[in-house]
Every structure is written in C-alpha cells, then in structure tokens.
Swiss-Prot record:
Pfam families in UniProt: Ribosomal_L12 (PF00542), Ribosomal_L12_N (PF16320)
UniProt keywords, alphabetically: Ribonucleoprotein, Ribosomal protein
Lineage: Bacteria, Pseudomonadati, Pseudomonadota, Alphaproteobacteria, Rickettsiales
GO cellular component: cytoplasm; ribonucleoprotein complex; ribosome
The protein's name in its UniProt record: Large ribosomal subunit protein bL12
Superkingdom as given in the UniProt entry: Bacteria
Organism, scientific name: Rickettsia typhi (strain ATCC VR-144 / Wilmington)
InterPro entries, A to Z: Ribosomal_bL12, Ribosomal_bL12_C, Ribosomal_bL12_C/ClpS-like, Ribosomal_bL12_oligo, Ribosomal_bL12_oligo_N_sf
Cited function: Forms part of the ribosomal stalk which helps the ribosome interact with GTP-bound translation factors. Is thus essential for accurate translation.
GO molecular function: mRNA binding; structural constituent of ribosome
GO biological process, one term: translation
Family: Belongs to the bacterial ribosomal protein bL12 family.
Summary of subunit composition and partner proteins: Homodimer. Part of the ribosomal stalk of the 50S ribosomal subunit. Forms a multimeric L10(L12)X complex, where L10 forms an elongated spine to which 2 to 4 L12 dimers bind in a sequential fashion. Binds GTP-bound translation factors.
Length: 125
C-alpha cells in the first residue's frame, strides 16, 4: 500500500505536459488508447493538452463596481437572484462579489449586459 501512495504522490506532482507524455508512453507500451469511443466519434483523436484548454461551458457573473446608478443595479440584482431588497443591497455594497454561478454563456452575457447598461462593471469568470 505504501508503494501505491508513492506512485500517487509522484503522479500528482506531474505537470500537464508530463502527464500527457506519460499517457502516450503507456498507450504505446500496453497497446491501448485512453480516448473514449464517444470522443473518437465526435472529435477524432483527442489531445490531452487540448482537452485541458477546452472551451468553458459554465460561467460566474461577478459584480466588480456599481457605477453611478446603484439603485438600478440593486433592482436588477434583486430580480436576477431572487434575493430580498436588503440582501441585494448588501451584495451590491460588498462588490466585488459573485452574483450568480454555473450559468450558460448566453445567460451570463445577458446578465452582464443588463448590469453594464446601468453603468455597473461586471466580469465573467
């Protein structure tokens, strides 16, 4: 069991490039492929480095500054989050603060545009 812990520790310390190279070496030695059949059908041969840089699918909207129209920003935050007026005001007062998480890109962009229309500064992460 101690040997497995050592191996786990060594693997955890590898960089992404080193891990990709290790995958290639093991695939060649064992005659197997780490690519799943679904990925092969949809994307061809998968590159581990490319998978790590895949397009982001979930976004977080972060209010960084309120601008001049703080009351309008509070109203929009209240509508978007479903918070009460006091909670929405507190969230706005504590900027920079995440407003909503795990959003699709289109929904995150829509929220960002609504807030920026009032003069607020917003980031998507």
């Amino acid at each position: 069991m101690a040997d497995l812990a050592k191996i786990e520790e060594q693997l955890s310390s590898l960089t992404l490039m080193q891990a990709a190279e290790l995958v290639k070496i093991l695939e060649a030695k064992w005659g197997v492929s780490a690519v799943t059949p679904i990925a092969v059908a949809s994307a061809g041969v998968a590159d581990p480095v490319a998978e790590a840089v895949a397009e982001k699918t979930e976004f977080e909207v972060v209010l960084t500054a309120t601008g001049d129209k703080k009351v309008e920003v509070i109203k929009i935050i209240k509508d978007i989050t479903g918070l009460g007026l006091i909670e929405a005001k507190k969230l706005v007062d504590e900027a920079p603060k995440p407003i909503k998480s795990n959003l699709k890109k289109a929904e995150a962009e829509e929220i960002k545009n609504k807030l920026e229309a009032t003069g607020a500064k917003v980031e998507l992460k």
